[in-house]
């Protein structure tokens, strides 16, 4: 059997000023108790595919590129903290697992919660001839992952007999927020871009996908 554990709250704060205690508790309860329920329910021969997140590194104070899987997590907010806790408990469970640390996932979805992800939000604004705001000038660097590649990789990991009890970064490209906005501008010149001094959680970081590519996934 294969279990793809996708349950979780995605309507989350991206900076401290946007968080609130009630929502944070809900995020943690669904993530931590929910994952424990999954671990307690599956048998030893079952393979668990778990999507974690790049934001477990949101506490990095300086720009860091090509972070590898053995880098110590430094979560701050409820969502990233609960994902880091999930990873720890999955590893300690003695169940068969593959953890995929996703970059910012972009692509078509009927889930409106995912519109808040930067590349999806910028695409929506561009389609409406709107204005993209670049917080802190758009200098933040991010690793992105196309939705189709996430689905392909989950299938690949679930079906692989050789890959067990491993953690992988799942990303395709790394770009600055400003570069994403400029791509949108090229596609739709009618939209506009402005810079602001709004808060960003960090200066950005990127994940290395070398370990993943060594498995044969393309």
Which residue ranges define each predicted feature?
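Helix N-cap/beta-alpha junction loops of NAD(P)-dependent oxidoreductase domains
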Residues: 10-15, 58-60, 108
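Conserved internal alpha-helix within the Rossmann fold of NAD(P)-dependent oxidoreductases
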Residues: 35-38, 87, 154
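NAD(P)H-binding glycine-rich loop region in Rossmannoid oxidoreductase-like domains
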Residues: 1-30
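Residue-level signal for the nucleotide or nucleotide-sugar donor/cofactor binding architecture
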Residues: 30-33, 70, 77, 113-117, ...
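NAD(P)-dependent short-chain dehydrogenase/reductase
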Residues: 88-142, 147-151
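C-terminal substrate-binding subdomain of Rossmann-fold SDR/epimerase-dehydratase oxidoreductases
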Residues: 130, 135-218
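Conserved Rossmann-fold NAD(P)-dependent oxidoreductase catalytic core, especially the SDR/UDP-sugar
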Residues: 5, 33-78
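Active-site helix of classical SDR
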Residues: 82
């Amino acid at each position: 059997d294969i279990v793809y554990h996708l349950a979780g709250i995605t309507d989350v704060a991206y900076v401290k000023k946007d968080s609130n205690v009630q929502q944070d508790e809900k995020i943690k309860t669904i993530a931590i108790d929910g994952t424990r329920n999954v671990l307690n329910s599956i048998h030893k021969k079952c393979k668990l595919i778990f999507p974690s997140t790049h934001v477990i590194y949101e506490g990095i104070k300086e720009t860091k590129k090509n972070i590898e899987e053995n880098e110590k997590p430094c979560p701050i907010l409820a969502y990233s903290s609960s994902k880091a806790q999930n990873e720890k408990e999955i590893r300690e469970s003695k169940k068969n697992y593959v953890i995929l640390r996703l970059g910012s996932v972009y692509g078509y979805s009927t889930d409106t919660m995912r519109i808040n992800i930067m590349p999806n939000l910028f695409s929506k604004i561009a389609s409406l001839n709107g204005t993209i705001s670049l917080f802190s000038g758009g200098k933040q660097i991010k690793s992105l992952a196309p939705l189709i590649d996430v689905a392909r990789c989950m299938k690949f990991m679930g079906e692989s007999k050789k890959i067990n009890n491993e953690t992988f970064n799942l990303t395709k490209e790394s770009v600055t927020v400003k570069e994403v906005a400029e791509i949108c501008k090229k596609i739709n010149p009618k939209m506009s871009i402005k810079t602001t001094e709004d808060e960003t959680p960090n200066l950005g970081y990127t994940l290395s996908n070398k370990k993943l590519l060594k498995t044969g996934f393309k």
